[in-house]
């Protein structure tokens, strides 16, 4: 696995009561998976758009802008993207004065708090983003369950 510098990022998750996550493509799947697991393992209210919401909210336009109207009610909004100049980072910039934000991305963003995952491929990034969010949970004291055959 890649060496990821978590710095102050666990404290963002720790202090948030509600978390909104978003991403594109495989990163949207990571966001949906993590919204479920953060809720299940921490008791925090977490949500991410599903494919029905992304197409219904967006219509012929950009779904991320419409969805952020919901996300801005969260204490923390996490965006997961493989490009630091994307619709995901633009959406985070729109709400960063209303709530705490965290961009998970391979490169540092010029104005967003960025957790850098130095991946070389899309798939490596998606898998490492998922693993990194589990590490954030462990850093705030969450005990993640073992596989059943290991118990």
Predicted regions and their residues:
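A short, well-structured juxtamembrane/interface segment
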Residues: 1-16
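Glycine-rich phosphate-binding loops that contact phosphosugars or nucleotide phosphates
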Residues: 24, 28-150
